[in-house]
């Protein structure tokens, strides 16, 4: 009996949390001699050295447009699944690919279709999210019932998928941080005179940064400081949040942090 051929599709993951998810998945494939792993990625430059047992196929053009992305998911993947005779197909970025395999899985992490309070200001501030709000629910629905399992990170998202798409195979898979803490020369707040609250998230409407700002306003005199991982230039929503916090000395905009910096900020926070 031949090996299982497991394809991990993540052509849209290039930076940040999603790219970390990809690396965590690839880490879990180590020492699985009964399987051959093939990863479909935007670029394998960083990954090949970290995961030499994985075969990488690059699709650098897919991320450039939704037309190319949909063609990839519904046409390219189907052809590839037949050529390589894949047994398992893992879609890491929301859309269930059109493939010919015995076992198919999808990881869904975009909550846009379930957003309940989208105001006119939200639409103007982040029009891309409004498009996600309108169309992502339709994209989720295509082929979703053909999956062996649908993975999400949170219990509330599981309930929404079960309700909206009548699914019984939704699995909550919470992130597991297996990365050790490392010293990178950052100055530590060892005196603990101030409380540090670290909120690492991209500036998107559904991340509710307004709640952080309101809390910071109330707690200005309590030595409680909030640290955010953007700088206000990323999009209109980021600019709005930055402006709301412009007079608050207990809100700190750190900008983008790499994985090591993130881990160390976690360690140094309360």
Identify the role of each PLM range.
Residues 79, 128-150:
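Membrane-proximal helix-turn-helix segments that form the acceptor-binding/catalytic region
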Residues 144-183:
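Donor nucleotide-sugar binding/catalytic pocket of nucleotide-sugar-dependent glycosyltransferases
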Residues 7, 22-28, 32-95:
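Active-site donor-binding segments of glycosyltransferases and PAPS-dependent sulfotransferases
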Residues 55, 239-260:
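Nucleotide-activated donor-binding/catalytic signature segment of Leloir-type glycosyltransferases, i.e.
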Residues 74, 264-269:
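Short alpha-helical donor nucleotide-sugar binding micro-motif in glycosyltransferases
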Residues 40-44, 225-239, 255-256:
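Glycosyltransferase donor-sugar binding loop
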Residues 21-22, 29, 197, 212-215, ...:
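A structural motif in glycosyltransferase catalytic domains
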Residues 7-8, 189-207, 213-216:
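Conserved donor-binding/catalytic core segment of Leloir-type glycosyltransferases
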């Amino acid at each position: 009996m031949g090996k299982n051929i497991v394809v991990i599709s993540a052509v849209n993951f290039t930076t940040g949390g999603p790219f970390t998810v990809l690396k965590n998945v690839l880490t879990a494939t180590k020492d699985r001699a009964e399987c051959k792993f093939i990863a479909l990625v935007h670029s394998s430059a960083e990954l090949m050295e970290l995961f030499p047992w994985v075969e990488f196929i690059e699709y650098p053009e897919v991320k450039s447009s939704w037309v190319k992305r949909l063609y990839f998911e519904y046409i390219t993947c189907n052809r590839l699944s037949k050529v390589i005779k894949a047994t398992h197909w893992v879609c890491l970025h929301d859309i269930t690919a059109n493939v010919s395999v015995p076992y198919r899985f999808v990881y869904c992490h975009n909550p846009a279709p379930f957003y309940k309070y989208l105001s006119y200001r939200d639409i103007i501030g982040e029009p891309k999210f409004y498009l996600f709000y309108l169309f992502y629910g339709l994209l989720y629905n295509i082929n979703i019932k053909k999956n062996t399992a649908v993975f999400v990170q949170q219990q509330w998202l599981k309930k929404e998928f079960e309700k909206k798409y009548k699914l019984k195979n939704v699995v909550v898979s919470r992130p597991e941080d297996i990365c050790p803490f490392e010293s990178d020369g950052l100055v530590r707040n060892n005196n603990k005179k101030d409380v540090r609250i670290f909120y690492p998230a991209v500036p998107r409407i559904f991340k509710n940064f307004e709640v952080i700002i309101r809390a910071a306003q109330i707690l200005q005199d309590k030595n409680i400081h909030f640290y955010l991982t953007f700088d206000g230039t990323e999009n209109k929503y980021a600019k709005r949040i930055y402006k709301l916090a412009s007079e608050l000395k207990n809100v700190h905009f750190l900008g983008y942090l790499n994985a090591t910096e993130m881990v160390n900020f976690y360690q140094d926070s309360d």
